[in-house]
Amino acid sequence: MRLFIIDTVATVIFFTAVATFSELLIAGMAPSEVLATRLLMVPVMVLTGRPYTRWRDWLVRRTAPRNRWSAFLTDILAFLSFQAPVYGATLLIAGASFAEAGTAIGSAIILMILLARPFGLFVEWTRSLFGVELS
């Protein structure tokens, strides 16, 4: 339960900060729209935060990255293989067509690649703050 809480809080903090920046400064959304979007995304992050970090932990143990480059690639593989399907399902549930979802996922992959390692490092840092180490 402790790891669930730590990983979920790390997920909510990291992606709320990144998405808020993106929505305000890149997408040009109004602060009220950003707030509404972020509040709607909290349940999604709560549902997917620990399952993602569990998947990432398994992949890290399985691949045993030996240097920064392999750790970077492992985080990208973990992030893309988990988050792209979640994002696609979210888009389809929200009413996007398959073509729209495909386009959105295609463009989001660039951001996913850029965010994968920083998020992995943030989760590891957050765990270390609370004295959690994985075997």
Swiss-Prot record:
HAMAP family: L_Ala_exporter. The gene is alaE. Belongs to the AlaE exporter family. One of its GO terms (biological process) is amino acid export across plasma membrane. The chain crosses the membrane at residues 9-29, 75-95, 96-116. Its main location: membrane. This is L-alanine exporter AlaE. GO terms for molecular function: L-amino acid efflux transmembrane transporter activity. It is found in: Cell inner membrane. The keyword Cell inner membrane applies. GO terms for cellular component: plasma membrane. Exports L-alanine. It is a multi-pass membrane protein. Keywords: Amino-acid transport, Cell inner membrane, Cell membrane, Membrane, Transmembrane, Transmembrane helix, Transport.
